[in-house]
Amino acid sequence: MKLPQTGGCQCGKIRYEITEAPQLVYTCHCTDCQRLTSSAFSMGVVVAETAFHLSGSEPRPLQRTADSGRTNTRLVCPECGSWVCGTPRDGVVRVRAGTLDDTSWLRPTRHIWTRSKQPWITLPQGDEIFEVSDPRR
């Protein structure tokens, strides 16, 4: 993986730069992520808040109470509606992997909310697998 990594929303009004290697790449199989992405799971990249730099349009915050009971705030483009990332929490930002300009290096190693995963999905042996949320995050 080459640094910095860049990305943004579908219309290009929001852009970002990641200046440090990510701490983690993960998949989330919760029903909210399935609905939000119209897919079987979402994929996120966890980066230090200090290494994530937004530019362009101001993202619009959307809040929702997750299956865990925690309120999550998604930052979306006010123009195209792309879900770019979450608000910073605990010193990190969870960036939506599909918004990266280069996704060739992505390899998730942690899978959360697998009790809701689609039955046809097989998770790799050796990866960290949690039926619900990762208790460390």
Model regions: which residues?
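A short Gly-Trp-Pro
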Residues: 1-137
